[in-house]
Regions:
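Bacterial N-terminal signal peptides
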Residues: 6-17
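Sequence-structural signature of mature extracellular/luminal beta-sheet repeat domains
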Residues: 18-150
Length: 150
């Protein structure tokens, strides 16, 4: 029951955020005359894009258990970490750590800039996580995540 209330609360927060003046119009975030460009087709199943404070975009290749990043300055993709616990959704906290939903063993991870990982939790409300999927971190470092039953 507490899990249902947590999910409803999260959805309510998401709805409030999406209807607030903080949401950008797509015309404001997509540069005029922008062109879609294929950066790479070497991945199996990508997930969880998140931008670091430098503008690099990190993403997971979940079946291959790796995290990569696209360096916006060089336009090259580099491997950041392998053996990620089959990371899915990602988000950067205010200290520059990459948080991941690592669903292989139902865990939420924190990975520092050097690629050193720490398991933050494997449970919520006394129950083991099923398969964390996506997450978001608020300005007070509160972590919100989805944990669906597949």
């Amino acid at each position: 029951m507490a899990c249902k209330h947590s999910i409803l609360f999260f959805l309510l927060l998401l709805l409030i955020n999406c209807t607030s003046k903080g949401v950008l119009n797509s015309k404001e975030i997509v540069q005029q005359n922008a062109k879609i460009q294929l950066v790479s087709n070497q991945f199996s199943f990508t997930e969880g894009p998140a931008s670091d404070r430098f503008g690099n975009v990190y993403f997971t290749d979940q079946p291959n258990d790796k995290i990569y990043f696209w360096n916006w300055k060089t336009n090259k993709i580099e491997e950041f970490l392998e053996k990620t616990g089959r990371a899915n959704g990602t988000f950067f906290d205010q200290k520059g750590n990459l948080l991941t939903c690592s669903d292989e063993n139902g865990e939420i991870w924190k990975i520092n800039e050097d690629g050193v990982a720490e398991v933050l939790t494997t449970s919520f409300g006394g129950k083991r996580l099923n398969g964390p999927n996506d997450l978001w971190v608020d300005e007070n470092n509160g972590i919100y995540f989805t944990d669906p039953l597949y």
